[in-house]
Amino acid sequence: MDTDANIGSGTVCGWSATGNTTFSQRNITVGVMKIQEALCPRSLEQYWMQSQLTAGSQYDGVPFEQAFSEQKALRIAEALETAIWQGNSYFSGVNQLLNAASGSTVLANASSTTWNPVSASVGITTSNVISIFDKVYNDIPQAILTKTDLVIFCGWNNFRTLIGALKSQTGVMYNQVDLQGLADGDIIYPGTNVRIVAVPGLTSTNRIVATYLGNLFYGTDLLSDEENFELWYSKDNDEVRFQAAFKAGVQFAYPDLMVDFRLA
């Protein structure tokens, strides 16, 4: 939804509509996914985990349930994080959606009178990373500059390169950048109102994406679905079974309010 605020004269009586509201729609393609795994407790007899197995040769429990569940939840979260940005077989990620919307998205690495595109052969380095982030920031549409949830997303590799450049080329690093934010991968870009957030899903892609959080949408059934799973011993099959089922998809509302940097 978008609406304007055209101010009209209030000196006369009567009704004279000056406002206009428009509605549009973008669809979220939600992928229906599941993860299933079968484990044989007998295979643990050759490892230290045998000490956690039930005495004897008949196993009817899940001795490693907590450790396995914690590790599996971590791996599911990592896989979903990558899918949100890069997509998978079941839904398109942000990068793929940006590729499809290139005609209306602000392309930060496009050639202009003031910018020479950075090629893949050159890459993002300590020599050019500050100018790249400056370009992304300067390309953010004026319509959203005053929003309090502006974010520039990048991969951890580019975040590390940026921090290295700030340390070596300017003294601003120690004066304006929050040290805890460095550890968390979440800082305010010096001299701006924009956060820079490092996300694993963009690591090694050399894509940098800027918009406001209210422009990004994550579609699912239940937010906790990927954390709710079953782990049980199947006596019929003489094995431990794991299953997780969830739905997920992403979309953005206004492509023209997205800044997309990709190497030329």
How should these model regions be labeled?
Residues 143, 148-158, 163:
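Beta-edge loop/turn motif
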Residues 129-142:
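Phosphate-interacting basic helix/loop segments used at nucleotide- and nucleic-acid interfaces
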Residues 140-145, 186-188:
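Short, conserved, surface-exposed binding loops centered on an aromatic residue
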Residues 75, 79, 136-139, 162-165:
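Generic, well-ordered alpha-helical scaffold segments in large soluble proteins
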